[in-house]
């Protein structure tokens, strides 16, 4: 079974959506990743990884640096990194040519569903062609296969840290804020470390619906996003293209 469940969070002491959806059977594996100035505010009965004081909201790259700390912590582990605002969902298996198992096209995961999802991803990480994996995004139209390989993934990702431990220090982890996960994942894929994305299990981000404020993203500017995306495009022009005229 997976070793650690990392949930980086900031300024959401009373809005721990993802944490509230973790099954009781897995709570002992949860590690909340928090900035040092607000550690005392969190009273949840879980493990904590307190970031160095210099990694805080005043740092443009605080999210990237937080994830770097997590990746280094997970060098020899099977672990996942989950945004703190996730609702886990399950699609109707009718989409994949199987008998319908629910009234609608999807529903929120039960605790049993979530345990099944964790077990599935844990097994995938033992396969030689899968170094990272996870669920798809609910807003994307699902494929008709149960999973896709070497495709887009974000917000909710499982890793086998041992697979790429030997190259971790060579990967770009703190070059950009916007799309930092895209840059990291493309760097893994381009080095032969494959992924797998479930179409059966998926997730929704509550922040994207405007239901939860985000101190990390709410002050985003076009200039910052453009600059960071240009960095990614320059590194991986064959996979990442900005289809927008700057003028």
Question: In which residue ranges do the predicted regions lie?
Answer:
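Short, solvent-exposed loop/turn segments at secondary-structure junctions
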Residues: 12, 38-39, 85-87, 138-141, ...
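A structural signal for short, well-ordered beta-strand segments and their strand-loop junctions
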Residues: 78-83, 131-136, 195-199, 241
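A short acidic (Asp/Glu
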Residues: 16-19, 42-43, 90-93, 143-148, ...
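Structural alpha-beta junctions
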Residues: 24-32, 44-49, 123-131, 191-194, ...
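C-terminal catalytic/acceptor-binding lobe
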Residues: 3-4, 11-13, 174-247
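Active-site-proximal specificity loops/subdomain of glycosyltransferases
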Residues: 33-77, 82, 87-103
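Conserved catalytic core of nucleotide-sugar-dependent glycosyltransferases
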Residues: 89-182, 190
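Short, well-formed alpha-helical segments that are part of the catalytic scaffolds
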Residues: 4-28, 34-43
């Amino acid at each position: 079974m997976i070793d650690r469940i990392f949930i980086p969070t900031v300024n959401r002491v009373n809005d721990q959506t993802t944490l509230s959806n973790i099954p009781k059977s897995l709570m002992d594996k949860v590690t909340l990743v928090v900035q040092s100035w607000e550690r005392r505010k969190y009273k949840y009965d879980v493990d904590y990884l307190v970031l160095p004081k210099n990694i805080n909201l005043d740092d443009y790259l605080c999210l990237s640096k937080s994830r770097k700390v997590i990746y280094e912590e997970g060098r020899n582990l099977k672990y996942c990194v989950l945004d703190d605002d996730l609702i886990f969902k399950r699609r109707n298996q009718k989409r994949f040519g199987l008998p319908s198992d629910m009234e609608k096209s999807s529903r929120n995961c039960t605790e049993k569903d979530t345990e099944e999802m964790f077990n599935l991803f844990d097994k995938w990480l033992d396969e030689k062609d899968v170094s990272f994996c996870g669920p798809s995004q609910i807003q994307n139209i699902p494929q008709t296969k149960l999973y896709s390989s070497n495709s887009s993934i974000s917000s909710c990702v499982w890793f086998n840290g041992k697979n790429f431990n030997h190259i971790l220090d060579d990967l770009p982890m703190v070059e950009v804020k916007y799309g930092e996960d895209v840059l990291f994942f493309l760097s893994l894929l381009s080095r032969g470390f494959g992924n797998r994305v479930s179409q059966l299990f998926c997730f929704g981000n509550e922040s994207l619906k405007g239901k939860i404020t985000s101190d990390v993203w709410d002050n985003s500017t076009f200039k910052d996003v453009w600059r960071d995306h240009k960095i990614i495009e320059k590194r991986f022009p064959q996979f990442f293209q900005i289809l927008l005229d700057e003028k």
